[in-house]
């Protein structure tokens, strides 16, 4: 296909103290959040004031953006927990028809298809499934996590889950940073620990 493989091109986005996510250097300041070990991902990625995460967004995209491969997030973070943790989510903000997460994104239909031959103990007819579609205001594109094995300052690179997806023009790309991610990984910091990120990193 003419659009595959994707021509390699790396773009670096830097978080800003005003909540922006821009091409260029990061702000020469730090921001902090307080870990909430019971916070859901849905709460963390919803816009508005939230002391339990940091959220950065680009401006509205003037043209479609294709993300292909594994995003990386580099940060310098300081904490005081015996063992700390950081989670990051890359988010597409913008209303669109998407595959919904409910029921693992599919539902069982009333029709059946035959796969091979039936036997006395195995019926080859199976109900068909279809994608569960619906409009949603956002979509998580990728996630990543890191465990911080001792208190202090850590400089690290988080390799996020690979994806190949197009973010439409008019949407915003967002990055949420949290501590515990109880829906995805084991919680190792169950306290209200303050995490500080140096945006110059």
Segment roles from a protein language model:
Residues 1-201:
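C-terminal, loop-rich substrate-recognition/catalytic regions characterized by aromatic stacking residues
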């Amino acid at each position: 296909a003419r659009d595959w493989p994707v021509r390699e091109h790396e773009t670096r986005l830097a978080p800003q103290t005003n909540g922006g996510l821009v091409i260029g250097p990061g702000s020469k300041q730090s921001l902090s959040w307080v870990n909430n070990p019971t916070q859901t991902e849905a709460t963390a990625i919803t816009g508005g004031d939230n002391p339990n995460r940091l959220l950065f967004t680009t401006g509205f995209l003037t043209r479609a953006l294709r993300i292909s491969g594994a995003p990386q997030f580099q940060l310098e973070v300081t904490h005081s927990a015996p063992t700390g943790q950081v989670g990051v989510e890359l988010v597409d903000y913008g209303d669109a028809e998407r595959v919904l997460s409910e029921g693992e994104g599919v539902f069982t239909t009333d029709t059946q298809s035959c796969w091979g031959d039936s036997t006395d103990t195995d019926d080859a007819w199976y109900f068909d499934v279809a994608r569960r579609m619906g409009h949603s205001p956002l979509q998580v594109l990728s996630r990543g996590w890191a465990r911080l094995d001792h208190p202090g300052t850590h400089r690290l690179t988080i390799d996020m889950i690979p994806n190949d997806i197009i973010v439409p023009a008019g949407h915003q790309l967002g990055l949420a940073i949290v501590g515990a991610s109880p829906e995805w990984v084991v919680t190792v910091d169950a306290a209200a620990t303050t995490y500080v990120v140096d945006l110059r990193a």
